[in-house]
């Protein structure tokens, strides 16, 4: 089953890019900013587990 989640957006509506795939401290910080406890770097963009609201940019 697919785990729900999404790519959070910054205040300019862009995804957060990342260089280190998989576990990524920067992505963890980004996801926590968006109220989600866990995330990682996938396809060079931060992806947050169980993050559903892509309109809540920070």
Swiss-Prot record:
Database matches in Pfam families: Toxin_3
SUPFAM superfamilies reported in the protein's UniProt record: Scorpion toxin-like (SSF57095)
Chief location: secreted
Source organism superkingdom: Eukaryota
Annotated disulfide bonds: 18-41, 27-46, 31-48
Coiled coil: none
Subcellular localization, as worded in the UniProt entry: Secreted
One Gene Ontology term, aspect cellular component: extracellular region
GO molecular function: sodium channel inhibitor activity; toxin activity
InterPro entries according to UniProt: LCN-type_CS_alpha_beta_dom, Scorpion_toxin-like_sf, Scorpion_toxinL/defensin
All copies of domain LCN-type CS-alpha/beta, residue ranges: 3-58
Expressing tissues: Expressed by the venom gland.
Keywords, alphabetical: Disulfide bond, Ion channel impairing toxin, Neurotoxin, Secreted, Toxin, Voltage-gated sodium channel impairing toxin
Keyword flag Disulfide bond: yes
Disulfide bond as UniProt keyword: yes
Domain notes: Has the structural arrangement of an alpha-helix connected to antiparallel beta-sheets by disulfide bonds (CS-alpha/beta).
Homology family: Belongs to the long (3 C-C) scorpion toxin superfamily. Sodium channel inhibitor family. Beta subfamily.
Its biological purpose: Binds to sodium channels (Nav) and affects the channel activation process. In mice, causes hyperactivity that persists until death.
Protein name: Dortoxin
Species per Swiss-Prot/TrEMBL record: Parabuthus transvaalicus (Transvaal thick-tailed scorpion)
Taxonomic classification: Eukaryota, Metazoa, Ecdysozoa, Arthropoda, Chelicerata
């Amino acid at each position: 089953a697919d785990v729900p989640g999404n790519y959070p957006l910054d205040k300019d509506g862009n995804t957060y890019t990342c260089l280190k795939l998989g576990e990524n401290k920067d992505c963890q910080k980004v996801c926590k900013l968006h109220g989600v406890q866990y995330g990682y770097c996938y396809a060079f963009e931060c992806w947050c587990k169980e993050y559903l609201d892509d309109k809540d940019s920070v």
